[in-house]
Amino acid sequence: YLVNPAAYAAPGAYMFLLILVGFPVNFLTLYVTLEHKKLRTPLNYILLNLAVADLFMVLGGFTTTMYTSMHGYFVLGRLGCNLEGFFATLGGEIALWSLVVLAIERWIVVCKPISNFRFTEDHAIMGLAFSWVMALTCAVPPLVGWSRYIPEGMQCSCGVDYYTRAEGFNNESFVIYMFIVHFLIPLSNNFFCYGRLLCAVKEAAAAQQESETTQRAEREVSRMVVMMVVSFLMCWLPYASVAWYIFCNQGSEFGPIFMTLPAFFAKSSAIYNPLIYICMNKHVRHCMI
């Protein structure tokens, strides 16, 4: 045990709570949206993709982490570590790139850089495919030798190897690639899109270019998507910051809890997306009732 054996009860209980809430909420989001035709809009396809990503994390990652927490170390071997790390990374990355697609959609629809553009089903499908391709370019390489998945923190869950310069895995190049392509670029895109979005909403309100009903509907959707992006950053920014700090200070000593806390905090992202979707979308609430 890396810490007091009693301490493993906390992550185990936390994972149980995330599974208890995350599975039914995300499954309900999928079921209600697919069941009601009026909810099957192109924009909601991307939101459904978020629910699928969260279910990957819940079923492929959280269940494994809860089981290993009960034993006090990662008992499932190399294959189990690869599977847990892959599903957790894949789910987080699908969610990240889905939010990128949503940000671009909001920017194009509200700011109108392309005149007479409509976000159609074909655009949504392209967005889904894009999010999956980008997610796989991050989750697959550690399985085939570019970096690797290893137990992290208290050794109850697995993640990308930020910690070592193990020969033959090229960890340094993969971590730099991951931070640039899968963190800084999406982050910059979202800041740009929402910066332009806020300006456009204010300008439209001042000029009264559209009807009050249209403006209100666009504001509600934009507010929901912004909330999702902010919540995503709140969950994943601490993990990314700590991981980068460890990567830049390899060889220094870090306590197991130092990486465990932000890693487990990041896992809560599987809950907030469907809750925001449900709480801020009156059509979804009405269909559930």
Swiss-Prot record:
GO terms for biological process: absorption of visible light; G protein-coupled opsin signaling pathway; visual perception. InterPro entries: GPCR_opsins, GPCR_Rhodpsn, GPCR_Rhodpsn_7TM, Opsin, Retinal_BS, Rhodopsin. Disulfide bonds join C81-C158. Phosphorylated on some or all of the serine and threonine residues present in the C-terminal region. Contains one covalently linked retinal chromophore. Coiled coil: none annotated. A motif ('Ionic lock' involved in activated form stabilization) lies at residues 105-107. It comes from the Eukaryota. SUPFAM superfamilies: Family A G protein-coupled receptor-like. The chain crosses the membrane at residues 8-32, 45-67, 82-104, 124-144, 174-195, 224-245, 258-279. This is Rhodopsin. The gene is rho.
